[in-house]
Every structure is written in C-alpha cells, then in structure tokens.
Amino acid sequence: MATAGSAASRRDPGRPCPFSIEHILSSLPERRPATRPPQPVGGRNPAELDEPEAPVPAAPCACCCCCNPRAATRGTPETSSGPGLRLAWPLRLAPATPSPLTAPRAGSPALTGTSGPGPQRRTRRHRTIFSEEQLQALEALFVQNQYPDVGTRERLAVRIRLREERVEVWFKNRRAKWRHQKRASSSRLLPGTKKTPKESC
C-alpha cells in the first residue's frame, strides 16, 4: 500500500489518490462524530473524553444503578445497590394508587364499620309484639314439643298469621328462657348455694 501511495504521489503530486493512507486518515475525523466507534481510553484526547459524557444522562434511565454509571459511582452502597433507587418508581406511582384504594376504604369499610352495622342490628332487633291468641298457641305447642320441625312451624305460622322465621325465633328464645328458669329452680333447691351469699352480705 505504501508503494501504491508513493506511485500515486509520483504520478500526480498535486492531487493525492483517493485510496491513499493520507486521504483515508484525513477523512476519518469527519466521520467520527456520526459513527463514534468505541476506542480505547488511552488513544482519546481530553476533548474527546468530555464529549460522550454530555449525552450519557439523557440516554439511560435514571431508575437503576445498572443503566446509569453516574448513579453507581456517586451513590452510597445503600443507594447504588437498589433500595433507594428502586423505590423511585413506587414513590412516583404512590400518588396515583391511593386514590382508588382510599375511595373504597372510605366508602365501604369505614361507613359499614360505624354506621352500617348500627342500622342493620336495629332492624334485626325489631321485636314482634305477639297477641294473646298467638302466645297461647305458641305456648301450647311448646309444651308438646320444644323443637318443632319446619312443617309444624309453618302450619302454626299460617294459623296465627305470622311468618315462620318469627315462630322459629320465638321457640329459640323460649327454650333459652326455659333453660334459665330450670337453672334458677335447681339453684333454689340447693340450700348451700343460697346461704353463702346471704351470710356474706
């Protein structure tokens, strides 16, 4: 190639050959800014070292230390390892996430916890006022059977003009009252249990 270059220079000393080494080397600086091939650090000038640092922060993402070399060198071991930098995305999304979550919390659990169960319990605690005829029919069946089946309760409910659910609840309450009365009567029969509270008073 040196011989070809020297032959070309001998032929036309005023105009260099387009394929000569001098022509190729002179055209390389014009193409370097466009292509920017990787070169060793030792071969670069101080001006060339400063040029790639300007576009570096814009090209990589700033969320992790793997993409951003400046974050790895600048940050402490805690921030460069990830906990501080990885939380950048959740912290950015934090204002958007509480809005849908706070709406149901304020609507359903808070309101149902304070005002919701109150009215529901009051509606469930609505007491039915039984007439004398209804109470007599219920007591008569209770004497015969303390645990009537569904069919018996339905027939009684139709006869006394009540719902079967009310009849079932009445029998549950009546059985609880009967057990309480039975315990009270059994405690009265035992003299030791009654004397001890009187003596203590």
Curated annotation (Swiss-Prot):
Keywords: DNA-binding, Homeobox, Nucleus. GO terms for biological process: regulation of transcription by RNA polymerase II. Its main location: nucleus. GO terms for molecular function: DNA binding; DNA-binding transcription factor activity; DNA-binding transcription factor activity, RNA polymerase II-specific. InterPro entries: Goosecoid-like_HB, HD, Homeobox_CS, Homeodomain-like_sf. Residues 123-182 bind DNA. This is Homeobox protein goosecoid-2. It comes from Mus musculus. The lineage of its organism: Eukaryota, Metazoa, Chordata, Craniata, Vertebrata.
